[in-house]
């Protein structure tokens, strides 16, 4: 209900980056205040720790939304688990001047680094097509896995498996999410939040129809 109250998860009619029409939309960028971002970083840090453990060096958040995600998660990881991990993000436009010129923000990737990728959500896996070659091309690194906030649980571009499973099969690293859409529906169906039922029968039917299609 926290993500609903903060308008991070919205219900309605949305056209996604993939072109799909969806009855729900997840936007971790709606976390905008200090306390909200602190909590978001803790969500990611706990999920990463539970899924992947401590054997990694760098949190990589693809530009643009992944930049603050990498920063707040690195801070939270240090506070929660006492482990210093570096953060790195790519630049959309390469910087050609100054001490930090190049294609990346934050820490430089080094040979031997073990990297965990962070995104808010992935629908079709398209962003990984751009990000994975950049990360692999920067140094001899191992991508340990990907963590997203929400597993939308819809099929990826191949039309058979969900996007997270497609990414796992294509690139050979693990994928995970803080929550799945099934968790969200179970938690909010016929439940009141801020004086109204969040997912009523009509919205539940729209979500079910979406999953029949995708």
Tell what function each PLM region has.
Residues 3-4:
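Short, small-residue-biased leader/transition segments that mark boundaries at the very start
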Residues 15-55:
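An N-terminal, well-structured beta->alpha segment
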Residues 17, 106-111, 168-169:
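Solvent-exposed alpha-helices and their adjacent loops that cap or buttress functional pockets
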Residues 52-56, 109-112:
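Short helix-loop-beta connector
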Residues 54-65:
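Short glycine-rich phosphate-binding loop at a beta-alpha junction
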Residues 71-115, 129:
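Short, glycine/charge-rich flexible loops or terminal/linker lids adjacent to PRPP-binding catalytic cores
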Residues 104-151:
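A contiguous pocket-lining binding segment that forms or flanks enzyme active sites
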Residues 133, 137-214:
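PRPP-dependent phosphoribosyltransferase catalytic core
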């Amino acid at each position: 209900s926290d993500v609903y109250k903060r308008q991070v998860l919205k219900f309605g009619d949305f056209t996604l980056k993939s072109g799909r029409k969806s009855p729900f939309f997840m936007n971790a960028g709606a976390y905008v205040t200090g306390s909200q971002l602190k909590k978001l970083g803790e969500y990611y840090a706990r999920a990463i720790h539970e899924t992947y453990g401590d054997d990694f060096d760098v949190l990589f958040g693809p530009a643009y939304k992944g930049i603050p995600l990498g920063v707040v998660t690195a801070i939270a990881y240090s506070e929660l688990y006492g482990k210093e991990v570096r953060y790195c993000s790519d630049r959309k436009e390469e910087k050609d001047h100054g001490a930090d010129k190049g294609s990346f923000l934050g820490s430089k990737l080094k040979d031997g680094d073990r990297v965990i990728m962070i995104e808010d959500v992935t629908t079709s896996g398209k962003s990984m097509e751009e990000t994975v070659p950049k990360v692999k091309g920067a140094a001899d690194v191992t991508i340990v896995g990907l963590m997203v906030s929400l597993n939308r649980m819809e099929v990826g571009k191949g039309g058979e498996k969900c996007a997270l499973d497609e990414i796992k099969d294509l690139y050979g690293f693990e994928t995970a999410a803080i929550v799945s859409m099934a968790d969200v529906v179970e938690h909010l169906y016929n439940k009141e939040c801020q004086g109204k039922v969040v997912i009523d029968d009509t919205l539940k039917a729209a979500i079910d129809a979406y999953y029949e299609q995708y």
